[in-house]
Amino acid sequence: METWKAVLLLAAGLLCGAWRWRSREKRRYRRSVYRAETGKQYKKVEENRGMDGEYRTSLELEKRIRGRRYFVFNAYIPCRSGGSTETDIVMIHEKGIFVIENKNYCGQVRGRANREYWEHILPGKRRTFYNPIYQNQGHVRHLRRLLGEHGYHLPMVSVIVFNDGVKRLRVKMAGSDAILCRSRRAASKINRRLRRMEQVLDEAEMEEVYGILKAQTRPFWWVRYGQRKRAEKLQKKAGKI
């Protein structure tokens, strides 16, 4: 009987601890920039790996990036040829624009900055995926053109972030000036780059750039559909290699 009591007390303690942890996570989410900008419910973000990865990365940046900054999530940037390309996170900083491609993977990632496809390795399984540096170069190019049309010609930094489920990140970055890191080191890497940059935007200009990009976060359904189909096509191509 005493054993059963001990088991029940242990189970109750674990459940209580889990409830308190979840409540604390929900409170933190409600106060986050990600929630304020996207309006998404915690449960939806928690159940979606992509959204959860973007949220975890943005939390790190929100807490530790120095200087004035704004965040824009999931902007659909128009392409010259028609259609659009979707950015994960754009950080508008007084010293420039940081275009962040977020990957919520686990296991190992291997590749080279100048190779078109990289490897994602899990126990007993390997798959290829499109080089996120190349992917983000497209985002930067279209974003540069969009802001240029509004008279803004700003320094832009490409940042590739893998969430901390990736235990080994083996990528040779020779020839690339992009930032590549896991999410727990994203803020320190970006702060290091910021120390080499000069201020280019005042508060009013930052707000204007924010408004330009924020207007791109609520596309018509067919814009989202076209972007999803292009992503699926690219992934199918990677799977054949």
Where are these regions (language model features)?
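Surface-exposed interaction regions that form or flank ligand-binding interfaces
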Residues: 1-85, 96, 125-241
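Short, basic/glycine-rich phosphate-binding loops at helix/coil junctions
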Residues: 36-38, 115-122
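Catalytic metal-binding acidic patch
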Residues: 86-92
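Active-site beta-strand-loop-beta-strand hairpin of nuclease catalytic cores
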Residues: 92-117
